Regions:
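Glycine-rich beta-strand-centered segment in the early N-terminal region that forms part
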Residues: 28-48, 61-107, 123, 143-144
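N-terminal Rossmann-fold cofactor-binding loop
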Residues: 237-241, 287, 336
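Rossmann-fold dehydrogenase core element
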Residues: 307-310, 320-360
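Short glycine-rich anion-binding loops that position phosphate/pyrophosphate groups of nucleotides
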Residues: 47-49, 98-100, 290-291, 314-315, ...
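Glycine-rich cofactor phosphate-binding loops and adjacent beta1-alpha1 units
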Residues: 180-209, 226-232, 244-331
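Hydrophobic/small residue at the entry helix of a nucleotide-binding pocket
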Residues: 217, 242
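NAD(P)H dinucleotide-binding glycine-rich loop of Rossmann-like/cofactor-binding domains
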Residues: 80, 97-208
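C-terminal hydrophobic helical "lid"/dimerization subdomain
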Residues: 38, 178, 267-272, 279, ...
Length: 401
């Protein structure tokens, strides 16, 4: 079956194209131990653009995409954020992106297989029709679909379950690792037993939290930390002006403080962070995508003794001096993934959120006429909206709600 969509290929001049593609439907499994199942047809309704899409385009430009293509193919239909209509089931759904022969995709091991719709070995959502394993079609809450149409305000929020689920996993990991890192000291300080100390420590790690970078991932993790730990002192650090909509929205959602990084040196920025927090950070989360974040945290001392450094940025290389690192008892980790329960919780939380306010729409005809130009001049350029999405099939959208 042929359908029209955007796809990546290894091509220095045109790594991203829009046109007819032959759909494939290999059997896939959601988790290890479950049966391999052929996909059922789904029709994308609204699809969001993610930084991963831009990175895949650049990989195609460099000729590095072959491992990402579905088996036997020389292209990858991209797109992994959004809502689909499932004709066979007469319902809207969110695609669970990650699956494979793995007992837990958040901690997959070298002897397990792994795929991602729209990103890695499986075709994605920027297409008129796609095949999806029926075990990987997640339900949406009641009340948002009426007469076969989805409320636009809700649809906009549903381009975020993937990154929001990633941040739910980040919160879980920071609580787990932070608790393990701190609980013995906490037990001594609070004069309590070790199990009680673990519970205290899971919150204490966020006592002075830095979120370095203010994209949607930084905004989401700040919001989630605040919901889970109302007592946390959260500081966003970014380059946007204090009075910009993005900053005002993020600060309001997370009930956080903000520091504009206009400093001449990393040392000055580190000093300002500590002053704003009232001490060195207990938790430093890097989401800026730059190599500056780890230098400010580790080299210039914004991260305090016994602190944790969570690298969620893709691209930067992290280095540190092993002598102070060991004596300061720092914990550095990175983890990018999520489980189905994270995504299901993300759908529920997002449905009650205001995150539709940060989504801008690009006209489908404009996008498909020249997708590379849209990427470079509308979606991933200086001054671009925080989040861009495209209504792929307007027949399923009620723009009055």
């Amino acid at each position: 079956m042929k359908a029209f969509g955007t796809y990546f290929q290894n091509d220095a001049r045109r790594p991203l194209r829009y046109g007819p593609v032959e759909l494939i439907n290999p059997p896939r499994q959601r988790l290890r131990g479950e049966p391999l199942r052929k996909g059922i047809l789904a029709e994308p309704v609204i699809v969001g653009f993610c930084g991963t899409d831009h990175e895949l385009m650049e990989m195609g430009r460099r000729g590095e995409l072959a491992p990402k293509f579905p088996a036997g193919q020389n292209r990858l239909i991209n797109g992994h954020e959004g809502v689909v209509w499932v004709p066979e089931q007469n319902r809207f759904a969110i695609v669970l992106i990650r699956g494979g022969d793995s007992i837990d995709p958040t901690r997959f091991t070298e002897d397990e297989t792994y795929f991602e719709y729209g990103c890695d070995q499986a075709d994605g959502l920027f297409c008129d029709r796609i095949y999806v394993n029926p075990d990987m079609l997640l339900s949406i809450p009641d009340g948002y679909a009426q007469d076969g149409k989805l409320a636009l305000s809700f649809a906009k929020k549903m381009v975020f379950p993937d990154p929001f689920a990633c941040m739910l996993f980040q919160l879980e990991r920071m609580e787990d690792l932070g608790s393990a890192h701190w609980f013995r000291q906490t037990a001594r300080r609070r004069h309590c037993d070790l199990e009680t100390a673990r519970k205290y420590a899971a919150g204490e790690i966020f006592e002075r939290t830095v979120i370095f970078g203010l994209g949607t991932t930084g905004m989401f993790v700040g919001d989630l930390i605040r919901q889970a730990h109302p007592e946390a002192n959260i500081l966003f650090v970014g380059r946007s002006p204090v009075d910009s909509f993005k900053v005002r929205f993020a600060v309001e959602q997370a009930k956080a403080n903000y520091l504009q990084n206009i400093f001449d040196s990393p040392a000055a920025c580190s000093e300002a962070i500590c002053a704003a927090l009232g001490g060195k950070a207990t938790c430093f989360i890097g989401v800026s995508g730059t190599g500056l974040e780890h230098r400010i945290a580790l080299e210039y001392g914004a991260l305090g003794c016994n602190g944790i450094y969570n690298s969620f940025s893709l691209g930067p290389r992290i280095s540190f001096d092993t002598m102070p690192f060991g004596f300061h008892n720092h914990l550095i980790f990175g983890s990018i993934n999520f489980r189905q329960d994270h995504m299901e919780k993300a759908i529920q939380l997002l449905s009650r959120s205001r995150y539709d306010e940060i989504v801008s729409l690009i006209d489908k005809d404009e996008f498909t006429a020249d997708p590379m130009s849209a990427y470079e001049n509308r979606i991933y350029c200086k001054g671009a909206p925080m989040k861009t999405a495209v209504i792929w099939n307007g027949d399923y959208i009620d723009s009055t709600r």
